[in-house]
From Swiss-Prot:
Family: Belongs to the herpesviridae US22 family.
Gene name, Swiss-Prot/TrEMBL: UL29
Region (Disordered): 1-33
Name of the protein: Uncharacterized protein UL29
InterPro entries cross-referenced by the UniProt entry: US22-like
Amino acid sequence: MSGRRKGCSAATASSSSSSPPSRLPPLPGHARRPRRKRCLVPEVFCTRDLADLCVRRDYEGLRRYLRRFEGSCVSLGWPSQCIYVVGGEHSPHSLTEIDLEHCQNDFFGEFRALHLIGTVSHATCRYQVFVDAYGAVFAYDAQEDCLYELASDLAGFFAKGMIRCDPVHESICARLQPNVPLVHPDHRAELCRRSRASARGRYLRSLLAFRELLACEDTAARCAYVEAHREAQLTLIWPEKHSLVLRTARDLGLSASMLRRFQRSLYTREPVMPLGEIEGAEDKTFFHRVRILCGDTGTVYAALVGQDKLVRLARDLRGFVRVGLALLIDDFRYESIGPVDRSSLYEANPELRLPFKKRR
């Protein structure tokens, strides 16, 4: 019996291996489709892929992606005939290492990592374009040595284009009104030099006023500092002769329901605490009585008079010290204020070098 079973199984195996697999005939009225050869989809530059690499902070992948599609062009939302050219650190229009370190160290009051993603060409001008660790897009104007924050992310950059860049507006106005005399280059260079020196001095004075509040690490510490230093005036970098007067919610007349209303107006719905309100040298200033609030994440907001929605001013308190209220008038220009360290505060207040008892 066992031998017979083995023979049957062997015969079955041999017959199954020798005979080809049977295929069902096609159904009547249905013809077989010929098999198509697989082909690779041609790779093209995609703005979504670039934005995804920046959001994930995959800078090694970003470097490879920029090198692969170097030279690709994308039309921006504004102005017309304004083109973004893909390129990284190996592109022919790339910055030198010295210029890149200058952009990272001398504009924000602290080091900020910037990654070159290409250039923008408009008329005869070229602007290098960077992204930072948070996805914000910046353009560098080498002629006036300043940075412009073009958008908070790459999607906004491709939609808005260079609408926040002042030299682009000036070049368009010069083309539309050719009879208007232009500023002499030497005079313009002197104005830029004075603007940089003024911005550095105002930033150091504001940083000196905010240094204790900047040392607070969380919301509880900031609340305690505001409560302990009520009516203290902290100088702003802009507008000039304006300061933030530290006041609590009770001093400002903000109820819990009003704070919740402010919170609901935010995309993140984070709790907010008041820092104070703005006071200027004159009561008729536009920024008088503007309330400043800070979220749990450190984001700084402004509450305009008579409005229930908050306006985002800066990503953190140190960023607010750097820009002040400039974003309320759509001023996104960063002057080169140079490197800032502990010894730089002596420029704003030379008496810090003296012993405590001899300071006035």
